C-alpha cells in the first residue's frame, strides 16, 4: 500500500466519523442528505460482498467492515433514531437517475462479466455520483453547517488522494484501472466548486453559503 492510498483511507474514515459525530452530538441530521447516505450504503454493500470469499489483509477486511457498519449506522440515525430532524423537504434529488444508469453501465462496461465484478463496477460508478443528492440539498438550502462542510471536504480529499494513488500505481507497478480512474475523476470534478467555497469561506471562519 502506498502513502496516497493510506492517506485517502484516513480522509475517508475521518469524513465518516465527522458525520456520525455531527449527528450524534447534535441529536440532529438537519442538513444531511439521507439519500446520499443510502447510496453510500449501497455502494459499500455492493463493493464488499466479497468480504467472506476474498481475504487480502487484516487492514483491508477491517476497513470493509467499518465502512459497511458506519454507512448503515448513519442511515439508521437519519431515518429512525433522529428522523424527526431529517429535512426531507429539501432532500428531493431523484436518485433513480443515478442508480439506473450506473447499474446499466456496470453491465455494459466492466472488467469481467461475473456477479461480484459487476457489483464492484456498479459500486465504483455509483460512488462517483452518490454525493450529488447532498450537493443538491446544499444548493437548495443555500448553505451548509461548518461540520457538514468539513465532512464534504474530507470526502473530496479522499477522492483526490485516490487519484494520486492510481498515478503512483501506474508509475511504479504498471497497474492501470480505467474504470476506477474515470469514476474518480468524475467524483473529484463534482467537488471542485465546493473546494473553492470551502477554502475561501469555511477556512476563514465563515459559514458556507452559496452566492445569491
Swiss-Prot record:
Site positions per UniProt: Interaction with the K-D-E-L motif on target proteins: 5, 117
Region (Important for recycling of cargo proteins with the sequence motif K-D-E-L from the Golgi to the endoplasmic reticulum): 204-207
Alphabetized PROSITE patterns for the sequence: ER_LUMEN_RECEPTOR_1, ER_LUMEN_RECEPTOR_2
Subunit structure: Upon ligand binding the receptor oligomerizes and interacts with components of the transport machinery such as ARFGAP1 and ARF1.
Membrane topology: Multi-pass membrane protein
A GO molecular-function annotation: KDEL sequence binding
Protein name as annotated: ER lumen protein-retaining receptor 1
UniProt GO BP: protein retention in ER lumen; protein transport; retrograde vesicle-mediated transport, Golgi to endoplasmic reticulum; T cell apoptotic process; T cell differentiation
Protein task: Receptor for the C-terminal sequence motif K-D-E-L that is present on endoplasmic reticulum resident proteins and that mediates their recycling from the Golgi back to the endoplasmic reticulum.
Region (Interaction with the K-D-E-L motif on target proteins): 47-48, 159-169
Segments traversing the membrane: 5-24, 33-52, 59-79, 93-110, 117-135, 150-168, 179-199
Residue numbers of Phosphoserine PTMs: 209
Species the sequence originates in: Mus musculus (Mouse)
Site (described: Important for recycling of cargo proteins with the sequence motif K-D-E-L from the Golgi to the endoplasmic reticulum): 193
Protein localization: Golgi apparatus membrane; Cytoplasmic vesicle, COPI-coated vesicle membrane; Endoplasmic reticulum membrane; Endoplasmic reticulum-Golgi intermediate compartment membrane
Database matches in InterPro entries: ER_ret_rcpt (IPR000133)
GO cellular component, one term: cis-Golgi network
Keyword Transport among record annotations: yes
